[in-house]
C-alpha cells in the first residue's frame, strides 16, 4: 500500500516540479530578476525584494544536477558521488539520486538511504538504518523507521514515521520517540510529537502530543496549548479558539454547546450596547474611501446582531491592501478571534503606496482618510466604536504609531511593528494624543531598514526622516502617557518591557526581538495586547 501511494505521488511530484514557475507570479507579483536581491520583507509565501519601485518575489536558486556519471559500481562505489542509482554498499556515497542501499554518510539522495547513517536530503526517507536520516532535510515522505530516524528532517509533506523535529509535515508523524518535535505546518497532525504546529486534524496521542500545536480545526487529542481548534481539544491545556468545546483541557474557552472542562473559542466579546439595526454589512467586501480601496474582512459566523471590535491594519511602503491582506499575522490573529479587520490602500507617492508619517513619501491626509473610513464602516456594519484598534508593519507601523498621536479619540490602542515615530513629528509638536494611549511596539535589533537605535533615513531621496530609535520611542510614549517608575519585564524570556503605572490605566510596551530584522512582530501578542483596551 505504501509503495503504491509513493509511486502514484512520485509522478505528481515530478510533474509539478517540472511545471513550477516563479512563486510570486501566482500571487500577482513579478519575480525579482536577481535571485540574490536584498530581502526587504519575509512572510509565509517567501522572501520579498524591491525592483523598479515595486515588490518582487526572490526566487531561490535550485540545483539541477543532470549528471548521470555511474561512478564505480565495483567495490560498492566508495566515495562514489553523483550516481543516479546509488552505492549498493559503499561509504560516503554522496549526491546519489536513488539512494545508498547500505552505505554510511549517503547524502543528497532523493529516494533514500535504505540502511545507511546520516542519509541527508532524501525525499522518501530512510527505511531502516541506525540514525537513518539524521539532519536529513527536505524529505517529502519521511523516515519509516530507524533509531532516531529523520532527526531535524524538515519540510516533509507526509511525515517522519519515527523521527524527531520532523518539520513541515502534512500528514504527520505516526509514532517514534518524541516523534516529530517542532513539526510545524501539518494539516493532518502529528500522531505523537511535541510542538506539532498548524495541524488541521490534530495530534492523536504521543508524549506531550502536540504542545503548542496551533491552528487545528478539529483538535489536539492530547497536547497542550493547542490553539485555534474548531471542534475541540480532547485533553490539552490552553486549547483556545474551539467552537464545540474542550472535553478535558484547561482554559479551553467559549463553547456553543457548553463548557465540559475548559474554555475555548474566539475570546473576544461582542457588545450588546450598540444599536445594530439597519447595519446590514456582515460579509467580506471592498469599500471606496476617497478614491482608495479598503478591504474589509469579517470573522466566520458573524451575524451582525452584536457589535464586534475592528482592527485597522496598515501595509508597508510599496505595499497595498491586497498584499497585506494575506501577509499580516496580527490581522490573522484578530480575525480568528472574532474581530473585523480592515486593510486600506495608502496614497501613491514617489516610492509607491505609502503613509504620511513624516517629511517623506506622501502628502496625503491619512488621518482624515482613517476617520472617513471609520465613519463609513460604523454606519454600515455593527462595529463597536469603543474598540477600534490599529496595527501595521514598516511604514504601516509608523502610521499606527502616528494614529496614537492624532486619532486617540477614535482608536483605542495600537500594536505597531518595525517603525518609530519620526523625530520631526515629535519635535514639531504633531504628536499630542487626546488621551492616554496604550501602545506596544515590536522592534528587531538587526533591522537594516529602520535601525533599532534610530537615526537619519532617506526612504525617499531628498526627503529624509529621522527615526527616534526603539528605546527613545518607548520612552517618549511613556512620557506622553504619564508613566512612572521603571518598566517591568512583562513575561520572563520574551524580552518585552512594559510600563504599567500610566495615566488612565493604559500600558506602554516594547518587545525587542534579539537578532530580528525588518519584520512584523508576534501577531497574537500584539492582538492580545490591544484588545484588552477600549475607549473611555
Curated annotation (Swiss-Prot):
Xref: PANTHER family: FERULOYL ESTERASE C-RELATED, PTHR38050
Span list, region Catalytic: 257-536
Regulation acting on activity, per entry: Inhibited by the specific serine esterase inhibitor AEBSF.
Pfam family, one: CBM_10
Glycan attachment positions: 65
This protein's name: Feruloyl esterase B
Functional summary from the UniProt entry: Involved in degradation of plant cell walls. Hydrolyzes of the feruloyl-arabinose ester bond in arabinoxylans as well as the feruloyl-galactose and feruloyl-arabinose ester bonds in pectin.
Cellulose-binding: annotated segments: 22-59
Domain CBM10 stretches: 21-59
Keywords: Carbohydrate metabolism, Glycoprotein, Hydrolase, Polysaccharide degradation, Repeat, Secreted, Serine esterase, Signal, Xylan degradation
Record text on subunit structure and interactions: Component of the multienzyme cellulase-hemicellulase complex.
InterPro entries recorded: AB_hydrolase_fold, CBM10/Dockerin_dom, Dockerin_dom_fun_sf, FaeB/C/D
One MF term in the entry's GO annotations: feruloyl esterase activity
Listed GO biological process terms: cell wall macromolecule catabolic process; pectin catabolic process; xylan catabolic process
Region (Disordered): 203-273
Catalytic activity, reaction form: feruloyl-polysaccharide + H2O = ferulate + polysaccharide
EC number: 3.1.1.73
Sequence repeats: 78-90, 91-103, 104-116, 117-129, 134-146, 151-163, 164-176, 181-193, 194-206, 211-223, 224-236, 237-249
Transmembrane stretches, start-end: none
Amino acid at each position: 500500500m505504501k509503495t503504491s501511494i509513493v509511486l502514484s505521488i512520485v509522478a505528481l511530484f515530478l510533474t509539478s516540479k517540472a511545471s513550477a514557475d516563479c512563486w510570486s507570479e501566482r500571487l500577482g507579483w513579478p519575480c525579482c530578476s536577481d535571485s540574490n536581491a536584498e530581502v526587504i520583507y519575509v512572510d509565509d509565501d517567501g522572501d520579498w525584494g524591491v525592483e523598479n519601485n515595486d515588490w518582487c518575489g526572490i526566487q531561490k536558486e535550485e540545483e539541477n544536477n543532470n549528471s548521470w556519471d555511474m561512478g564505480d559500481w565495483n567495490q560498492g562505489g566508495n566515495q562514489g558521488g553523483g550516481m543516479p542509482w546509488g552505492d549498493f554498499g559503499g561509504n560516503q556515497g554522496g549526491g546519489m539520486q536513488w539512494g545508498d542501499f547500505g552505505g554510511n554518510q549517503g547524502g543528497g539522495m532523493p529516494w533514500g538511504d535504505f540502511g545507511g547513517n546520516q542519509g541527508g536530503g532524501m525525499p522518501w526517507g530512510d527505511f531502516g538504518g541506525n540514525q537513518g536520516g539524521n539532519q536529513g532535510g527536505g524529505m517529502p515522505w519521511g523516515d519509516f523507521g530507524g533509531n532516531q530516524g529523520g532527526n531535524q528532517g524538515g519540510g516533509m509533506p507526509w511525515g517522519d514515521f519515527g523521527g524527531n523535529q520532523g518539520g513541515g509535515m502534512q500528514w504527520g508523524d505516526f509514532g517514534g520517540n518524541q516523534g516529530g518535535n517542532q513539526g510545524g505546518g501539518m494539516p493532518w497532525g502529528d500522531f505523537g510529537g511535541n510542538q506539532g504546529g498548524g495541524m488541521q486534524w490534530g495530534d492523536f496521542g504521543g508524549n506531550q502530543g502536540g504542545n503548542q500545536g496551533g491552528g487545528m480545526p478539529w483538535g489536539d487529542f492530547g497536547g497542550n496549548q493547542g490553539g485555534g481548534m474548531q471542534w475541540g481539544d480532547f485533553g490539552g491545556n490552553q486549547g483556545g479558539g474551539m467552537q464545540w468545546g474542550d472535553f478535558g483541557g484547561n482554559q479551553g474557552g467559549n463553547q456553543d454547546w457548553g463548557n465540559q472542562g475548559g474554555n475555548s473559542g474566539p475570546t473576544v466579546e461582542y457588545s450588546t450596547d450598540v444599536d445594530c439595526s439597519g447595519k446590514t454589512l456582515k460579509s467580506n467586501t471592498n469599500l471606496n474611501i476617497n478614491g482608495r480601496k479598503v478591504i474589509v474582512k469579517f470573522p466566520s459566523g458573524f451575524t451582525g446582531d452584536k457589535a464586534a471590535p475592528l482592527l485597522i491594519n496598515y501595509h508597508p511602503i510599496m505595499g497595498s491592501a491586497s498584499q497585506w491582506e494575506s501577509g499580516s499575522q496580527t490581522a490573522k490573529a484578530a480575525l480568528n478571534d472574532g474581530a473585523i479587520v480592515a486593510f486600506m490602500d495608502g496614497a501613491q507617492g514617489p516610492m509607491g503606496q505609502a503613509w504620511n508619517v513624516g517629511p517623506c513619501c506622501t502628502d496625503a491626509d491619512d488621518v482624515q482618510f482613517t476617520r472617513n473610513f471609520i465613519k463609513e464602516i460604523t454606519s454600515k456594519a455593527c462595529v463597536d466604536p469603543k474598540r477600534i484598534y490599529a496595527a501595521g508593519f514598516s511604514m504601516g507601523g509608523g502610521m499606527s504609531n502616528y494614529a496614537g498621536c492624532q486619532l486617540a479619540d477614535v482608536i483605542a490602542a495600537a500594536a505597531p511593528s518595525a517603525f518609530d515615530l519620526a523625530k520631526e513629528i515629535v519635535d514639531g509638536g504633531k504628536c499630542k494624543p487626546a488621551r492616554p494611549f496604550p501602545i506596544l511596539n515590536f522592534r528587531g535589533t538587526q533591522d537594516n531598514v529602520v535601525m533599532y537605535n534610530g537615526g537619519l533615513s532617506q526612504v525617499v531621496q531628498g526627503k529624509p526622516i529621522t527615526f527616534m530609535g526603539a528605546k527613545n520611542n518607548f520612552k517618549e510614549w511613556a512620557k506622553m502617557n504619564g508613566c512612572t517608575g521603571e518598566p517591568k519585564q512583562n513575561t520572563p524570556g520574551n524580552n518585552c518591557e512594559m510600563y504599567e503605572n500610566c495615566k488612565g490605566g493604559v500600558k506602554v510596551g516594547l518587545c525587542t526581538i534579539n537578532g530580528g530584522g525588518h519584520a512584523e512582530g508576534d501577531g497574537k501578542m500584539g492582538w492580545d495586547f490591544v484588545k484588552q483596551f477600549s475607549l473611555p
